[in-house]
Amino acid sequence: MLIPRKVKHRKQHHPEQRGIASGGTSVSFGDYGIQALEHAYITNRQIESARIAINRHIKRGGKVWINIFPDRPLTKKPAETRMGSGKGSPEWWVANVKPGRVLFELSYPDEKTARDALTRAIHKLPIKARIVTREEQF
């Protein structure tokens, strides 16, 4: 699982989900990529699930890059707890994703297999996304 090693503050405010991505909008490492089309919080478990889906489909001969990192904690209070008494404890680590951000990149010689692998990964993510190539832009 992807989690930060050390954080300055254990609990944070929720980041705003508005605007479009200013950086990381083009495929820079691989040949194909998954580009987000809407705002979302993507958890470390969802990132890991998508990575496993890609790796199982391509088997060997390809390389995968993960361009997002879950660096924000989301908190939750226990069930059946009265209101008040402070903020809940951190439960998940999430990455704040904006439209246009390239989440995963893949380098693989066969285009059809690469697109199938990325499609499987998109189904594991909680957002609408599309497959882009190195030549395409947002």
Swiss-Prot record:
**Keyword Nuclease belongs to the record:** no
Pfam family, any one = Ribosomal_L16
Q: Which GO terms describe its cellular component?
A: cytosolic large ribosomal subunit
Kindly state which keywords UniProt assigns to this record, in alphabetical order.
Answer: Ribonucleoprotein, Ribosomal protein, RNA-binding, rRNA-binding, tRNA-binding
- Region ranges (Disordered): 1-24
Q: Which PROSITE patterns match?
A: RIBOSOMAL_L16_1 (PS00586), RIBOSOMAL_L16_2 (PS00701)
Q: Give GO MF terms, alphabetically.
A: rRNA binding; structural constituent of ribosome; tRNA binding
Comp. bias regions, Basic residues: 1-13
Q: Would you kindly state one Gene Ontology biological process term found in this protein's UniProt entry?
A: translation
The UniProt record lists the keyword Ribonucleoprotein: yes
Q: Supply the CDD domains for this chain.
A: Ribosomal_L16_L10e (cd01433)
Q: Which HAMAP family match?
A: Ribosomal_uL16
Q: Quaternary form?
A: Part of the 50S ribosomal subunit.
Q: What does this protein do?
A: Binds 23S rRNA and is also seen to make contacts with the A and possibly P site tRNAs.
Entry similarity comment:
Belongs to the universal ribosomal protein uL16 family.
What is this protein's record name? Large ribosomal subunit protein uL16
Which taxonomic lineage is given here? Bacteria, Bacillati, Actinomycetota, Actinomycetes, Mycobacteriales
